[in-house]
Amino acid sequence: MTDNCREDDDNLGTSGDNALSAPTQLLVTPPAPHQTIVPPLNFCPVERYLYRSGQPSTVNFPFLLNLNLRTIIWLANEEPQDALLAFCDMHDIRLRFAAINPEGGEDDNPWDGLTEHSIVSALQTIVHRDNYPLLVCCGMGRHRTGTVIGCLRRIMGWNLASVSEEYRRFTGSRGGRILVELLIEAFDTKSVTIDKANAPEWLATAVSASEASYVPATTYSIHEM
């Protein structure tokens, strides 16, 4: 019986040696393709499904796809880059032009022809929820975009200090343009028609709150003074 046990031990040892000496097969899984997600220059959410930025380039397109954009508002006299036009066409994104100065050309100073009509045109697109998700953009995403967003904040009932602070946040070390801030301050919020039933929920809520808190100025007749 001892010999049988010894034989079993020898067989076990041999089997173990074979197991250790057997070549190990490694399954190599190729790495997943790496896709860089880069937001456009000065990109920032404004409200739910409303965004702002500078002009998107091809490197930003994968990022934009994640937003499921329905509309892009382009604030400039010139057309955007061909790549952006093709991207919008390929993904069925509506591109709305809101020319700063419709009579000006590519070399025209945009601030010479800044009109309330151009701003109202952009805002009329923003206040309708069927255009969302929506991106507002211009060349750098600073002054032109900041003007439209600033006027939107006025409609929402923001005070001027808060509007100016948000505008300057995107203007960089040079600071804001006094012309822009004066235009935002003087903007007639009643020039934009808002249908609350078709407006984004956050806008309808803000407008209702602003209207509820509005206190008309007290007027006096000559006889009361």
From Swiss-Prot:
Compositional bias annotation for Polar residues: 12-24
Bias-annotated ranges (Acidic residues): 1-11
The UniProt record lists the keyword Cytoplasm: yes
Residue ranges constituting the Tyrosine-protein phosphatase domain according to the UniProt record: 42-196
GO cellular component: cytoplasm
Top EC category: hydrolase
One biological process term in Gene Ontology: cellular response to oxidative stress
Catalysed conversion reaction: O-phospho-L-tyrosyl-[protein] + H2O = L-tyrosyl-[protein] + phosphate
Top-level taxon: Eukaryota
Catalytic residues (positions): C138 (phosphocysteine intermediate)
Region described as Disordered: spans on this chain: 1-24
Keywords carried by this UniProt record: Cytoplasm, Hydrolase, Protein phosphatase, Stress response
Enzyme Commission identifier(s): 3.1.3.48
Record-stated family: Belongs to the protein-tyrosine phosphatase family.
Free-text function comment from the UniProt entry: Putative tyrosine-protein phosphatase required for protection against superoxide stress.
Protein name per its UniProtKB record: Putative tyrosine-protein phosphatase OCA1
Organism: Eremothecium gossypii (strain ATCC 10895 / CBS 109.51 / FGSC 9923 / NRRL Y-1056) (Yeast)
